[in-house]
UniProtKB/Swiss-Prot annotation:
Lineage: Bacteria, Bacillati, Actinomycetota, Actinomycetes, Mycobacteriales
Oxidoreductase among keywords: no
Pfam families cross-referenced by the UniProt entry: Hexapep, NTP_transf_3
UniProt organism field: Corynebacterium aurimucosum (strain ATCC 700975 / DSM 44827 / CIP 107346 / CN-1)
Cofactor(s) needed by this chain: Mg(2+)
Residue positions of the active site: H373 (proton acceptor)
Protein name listed in UniProt: Bifunctional protein GlmU
Chain segments carrying region N-acetyltransferase: 262-487
Cellular compartments annotated: Cytoplasm
Length: 487
């Protein structure tokens, strides 16, 4: 495909989107971990345009900062033009063109609520537009059921004679299955001139961009249409139902891309993959798994089932089962889960383990270190090849401030150990079960706490008479006495 040159793009994002019934501006709703407007701008930026303009209007206090953030993400300058009063698509393009006062090349106009459009399709539109020497080129699509869409009518030479809306179409015209998508390529000079001739003499009292086609034809210019290969790319989003439908279509695209890249996805219907996720080869993803943000899954890892990872780096060969994790790193060949909660700032070393019902936060765990089960570990550093016993708690919060715990390498702690931070446990140290560690433990030492166990005989029967426990104790004592008598 030829390189795109002398091109600008205008993305329309000024509408109110009332059918979304939301305090969030329509184009800022997300699918695949990216806003609708973000998807549209990524597609337009794929043209490498000389100028990229977003027309903002309704709730621009929300949209403008979002545009700035997307511009930074794309590393691409994005201008903003304001449509103070939403007076139709033609008026919106007038506002966008005001940001391009000296530009007369090809102007691509697309919409901020069409998230599935690929850059390749826009490049094909540009190529058809310039290759056919059109003044206007409509990006059209062929639908099995075109009801509700404006029909694209063509002359014998293939040029477009008109776009007729459903309500204005004759019975014969309604049989046409090629329809307008609302995406166009314009000759900049022709567009600039035609916009001055638009009028609002219509039922809505608005300026329509589709009227530019008739104005261009009357001026003797050629109007053409390029049929998109996949109509699903041009699915617009106007309400929550369409938002969900577009999300499913995008996710199917992401899942199929992953499988073609060498990933086994056991159940594509219950697997969700965001657009910024990277997955290696020979990865296995089990059902009910969601991967979001900048999550990366290295070769040979296994994720799921019932797992949600957001901004997580998973190393090669690691296993992550029934885990919710955020903003953390899991080393190669590490084992995570089941029922593990990884909060931001966790680094699990190679061959490390966070087991069942473990919650970790802002913690670095060394190579081969295991936290097997029923443990909270937060604000801690643990060295290599240590083992934290079951039901241990890193007591990091004093009610005002968080404090750090440092555990050395080759440490073995007994079950139900409490680490009262700030505290340090040296290399090779041990702790007994039930130990409360309030002071530093030297390397190689055994830490124990609590006095000798004391049993108060008969306490239950004296203090809790008549209870099932007292009755059970009495029976046991009687049985013991009978055994002694018999013997």
């Amino acid at each position: 495909m030829a390189e795109v040159t002398n091109c600008a793009a205008i993305v329309l994002a000024a509408g109110a989107g009332t059918r979304m019934k939301s305090s969030t501006q329509k184009t800022l709703h997300e699918i695949g971990g990216r806003s609708l407007l973000g998807h549209a701008l990524h597609a337009a930026a794929g043209l490498n345009p000389e100028h990229l303009v977003v027309v903002v209007g309704h709730q621009r206090d929300q949209v403008s900062p979002a545009v700035d953030a997307i511009s930074e993400e794309l590393d691409c300058a994005v201008s903003q033009a304001v449509q103070e009063e939403q007076n139709g698509t033609g008026h919106a393009v007038q506002c966008g063109l005001s940001a391009l006062p000296e530009f007369d090349g090809t102007v691509i106009v697309t919409n901020g609520d069409v998230p599935l459009l690929r850059p390749e399709t826009l490049r094909q539109l540009h190529e058809a537009h310039t290759g056919e020497a059109n003044a206007v080129t409509v990006l059209s699509m062929t639908l099995e059921d075109p009801t509700g869409y404006g029909r694209v009518l063509r002359a014998d030479d293939g040029s477009v004679t008109a776009i007729v809306e459903q309500k204005d179409a004759s019975e014969e015209q309604r049989k046409v299955r090629e329809v307008n998508s609302g995406v166009f390529a314009f000759d900049g000079a022709v567009l600039r001139d035609a916009l001055t001739k638009l009028n609002s003499d219509n039922a809505q009292g608005e300026l329509y961009i589709t009227d530019v086609l008739e104005i261009a034809r009357e001026a003797g210019h050629r109007v053409g249409a390029h049929v998109a290969a996949d109509p699903e790319e041009l699915s617009g989003v106007n309400d929550r139902v369409q938002l969900a439908a577009a999300g499913r279509l995008l996710n199917r695209r992401m899942v199929e891309e992953a499988m073609r890249g060498g990933t086994t996805i056991v159940d594509p219907d219950t697997t969700w993959i965001g657009v910024n996720v990277t997955i290696g080869q020979d990865v296995v993803i089990h059902p009910n798994t969601q991967l979001w943000g900048a999550t990366t899954i290295a070769d040979g890892a296994e994720v799921g089932p019932d797992t949600t990872l957001t901004n997580i780096q998973v190393g090669a060969g690691a296993s992550v089962v029934r885990t919710h994790g955020f903003d953390s790193v899991i080393g190669s060949n590490a084992q995570i889960g089941p029922f593990t909660y990884i909060r931001p700032g966790v680094i699990v070393g190679e061959e490390g383990k966070l087991g069942g019902f473990v919650e970790a936060k802002k913690t670095q765990i060394g190579r081969g270190t295991k936290v097997p089960h029923l443990t909270y570990i937060g604000d801690a550093t643990v060295g290599d090849y240590s083992n934290i016993g079951a039901s241990s708690v890193f007591v990091n919060y004093d009610g005002v401030n968080k404090h750090h715990t440092t555990i050395g390498s080759h440490v073995r702690t007994g079950s139900d150990t409490m680490f009262i931070a700030p505290v340090t446990v040296g290399d090779g140290a041990y702790s007994g079960a039930g130990t409360v560690i309030k002071d530093d433990v030297p390397p190689g030492a055994l830490a124990v706490s609590g006095g000798k166990q004391r049993n108060i005989e008969g306490w239950v029967q004296k203090k809790r008479p008549g209870t099932p426990a007292a009755e059970a104790a009495g029976k046991a004592q009687d049985a013991k006495a009978n055994d002694q008598t018999t013997n």
